[in-house]
């Protein structure tokens, strides 16, 4: 889906373009560079990606229709320490790698136009992690019902 570029970058660039034109220096350089990637996407590529996205959504909805909800980690990794990814050229690669992993699971649900919630499920005193309960668009009630039941079970522990 992202081979020709990112829908998020194109859409964020469309929104931020007037502000960037006047105040680009006020943006975090890492964030600004990701937004500015959207300037390179053509209208043809954007429309192609939107059609591909709609086809992907339809396939996903058909596959998950019989499930109450789907479960996955909210993030793929425990977020790194700030000192490991703090601004600085030497840490940029680590930042972008961690950022991609932290956003990966929720971005998939967003790209699929799904709905989700995240339940904290970490052991007291350990770094926080979340369990994402998700489903296709319009299945909010199912997600909330499953999430409430899981929350009740987690509280018994």
Question: Which residues does each predicted region cover?
Answer:
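Short, surface-exposed loop/helix-turn segments at secondary-structure junctions
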Residues: 4, 48, 80-103
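Short, hinge-like loop/turn segments at secondary-structure boundaries
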Residues: 5-11, 88-90, 135-136
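Short helix-loop capping/hinge segments that flank enzyme active sites or metal/cofactor-binding pockets
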Residues: 6-57, 61, 77, 118-128
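Structural helix-boundary/capping segments
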Residues: 40-41, 47, 58, 110-157
């Amino acid at each position: 889906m992202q081979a020709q570029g990112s829908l998020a970058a194109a859409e964020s660039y469309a929104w931020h373009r007037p502000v960037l034109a006047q105040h680009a220096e006020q943006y975090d350089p890492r964030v600004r560079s990701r937004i500015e990637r959207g300037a390179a996407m053509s209208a043809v590529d954007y429309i192609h990606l939107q059609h591909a996205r709609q086809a992907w959504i339809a396939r996903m909805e058909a596959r998950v229709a019989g499930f109450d909800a789907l479960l996955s980690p909210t993030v793929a990794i425990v977020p790194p320490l700030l000192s490991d990814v703090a601004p600085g050229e030497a840490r940029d690669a680590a930042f972008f790698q961690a950022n991609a992993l932290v956003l990966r699971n929720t971005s998939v649900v967003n790209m699929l136009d799904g709905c989700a919630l995240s339940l904290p499920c970490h052991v007291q005193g350990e770094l926080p992690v979340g369990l994402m309960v998700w489903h296709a668009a319009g299945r909010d009630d199912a997600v909330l019902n499953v999430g409430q039941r899981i929350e009740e079970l987690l509280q018994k522990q």
